Amino acid sequence: MATLEVLRFPDERLRTIAQEVAHVDDQVRVIIKDMLETMYDENGIGLAATQVNIHQRIVVIDVSEERNEPLVLINPQIIKKDGTTVSEEGCLSVPNSYAKVDRAETVTVAALNEQGEEFVLDADELLAICIQHELDHLQGKLFIDYLSPLKRQRIRKKLEKEAKFAE
């Protein structure tokens, strides 16, 4: 297993639309293991493959307290949304930035697991929010895209300044 580099906004590769996974095989399972290791190493609760410059429809999530209940979603699709909720979100690709985002309160998602088997999952609370956030990444969308242009520009400038200091 390997820790992967997480792309940071404003990296344009984050805007890539992910492609369907044609076959769930050992190569895909290695990607999943590396993504989980990266997510845990970065103290995240979710990670989309596009965030680590792999442009396939793969998401890993773990919202459990003990960080021992990983959820793998391959080729996920939200098939039902209900209600609305506002949540404060952050993102490994937009470090140290948080904003309130409107999301569906509950979602039903259809996906493949790491054995390539289809399943359907009903999610609410943090899991529903995380699923929506990560699936946005697969479409090249970031949580800051829900913000006003002014707020988005402030975050961009802040991250560019932090990147200069890190060099």
UniProtKB/Swiss-Prot annotation:
GO BP, one annotated term: co-translational protein modification
Required cofactor names: Fe(2+)
Active-site residues from the entry: E134
Keyword Protein biosynthesis among UniProt keywords: yes
GO-annotated molecular function: metal ion binding; peptide deformylase activity
Reaction(s) this enzyme catalyzes, per UniProt: N-terminal N-formyl-L-methionyl-[peptide] + H2O = N-terminal L-methionyl-[peptide] + formate
CDD domains associated with the record: Pep_deformylase
Disulfide bonds: none
Keyword Zinc: no
Protein residues bound to Fe cation: C91, H133, H137
EC number of the protein: 3.5.1.88
Broad class of enzyme this protein falls into: hydrolase
Family stated for the protein in its record: Belongs to the polypeptide deformylase family.
Designated name of the protein: Peptide deformylase
Lineage of origin: Bacteria, Pseudomonadati, Pseudomonadota, Gammaproteobacteria, Alteromonadales
Gene: def
